[in-house]
């Protein structure tokens, strides 16, 4: 569901992580995981003009319930031959992001005559969390996750982002990592070939910049 005048979007979907598609030596699961998920996004551009720069903020988030296709995993100790059974927990997976759009600020609120590079930036803070909620016998009931502050540069045909990955507790990790992303807009770069939709008619390109 989309409500353009109020800059609101709601979406329901299902995420599937297929089991048996990786090496077990590096921790790949033999079972699949199905996660029904609810997504939302809200821009603040519909606020009164008197709120000024606040209207360039946007909030997104998702909440899902992770369900393994197998309730437990059995393994055999190669030395003793003993069979151990480990439960596969169900998790609540959720996250959010808060971002500030410099392109929106310039085009819809006020042009501060900033350098062009700055006008393409979107500072962002993302957070992702996982909480065990069922079938977690014998394991700690601890929420894990990360908080990821960063920035995205948005162009007409691609965007580049970089974020720090900060664990929220020791169970989530002991060091700070870095995540980098390059996102190509194939529908704008190749609108008549690989950027075409499989079904239906392509919408006119919506380039944020000339």
For every predicted segment, state its role.
Residues 1-96, 138-141, 190, 210:
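Outer-membrane pore/translocation modules
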Residues 85-209:
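Outer membrane beta-barrel transmembrane domains
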């Amino acid at each position: 569901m989309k409500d353009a005048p109020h800059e609101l979007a709601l979406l329901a979907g299902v995420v599937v992580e297929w089991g048996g598609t990786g090496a077990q030596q590096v921790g790949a699961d033999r079972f699949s995981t199905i996660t029904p998920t609810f997504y939302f996004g809200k821009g603040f551009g519909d606020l009164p003009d008197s709120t000024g720069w606040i209207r360039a903020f946007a909030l997104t988030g998702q909440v899902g319930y992770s369900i393994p296709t197998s309730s437990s995993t059995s393994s055999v100790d190669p030395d003793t031959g003993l069979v151990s059974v480990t439960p596969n927990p169900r998790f609540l997976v959720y996250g959010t992001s808060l971002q500030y759009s410099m392109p929106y600020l310039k085009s819809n609120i006020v042009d501060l005559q900033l350098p062009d590079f700055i006008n393409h930036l979107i500072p962002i803070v993302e957070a992702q969390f996982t909480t065990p909620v069922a079938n977690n016998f014998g394991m700690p009931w601890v929420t894990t996750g990360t908080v990821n502050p960063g920035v995205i540069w948005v162009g007409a045909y691609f965007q580049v982002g970089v974020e720090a990955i900060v664990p929220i507790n020791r169970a989530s990790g002991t060091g700070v990592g870095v995540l980098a992303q390059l996102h190509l807009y194939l529908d704008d770069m190749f609108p008549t070939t690989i950027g075409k939709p499989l079904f239906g008619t392509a919408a006119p390109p919506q380039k944020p910049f000339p």
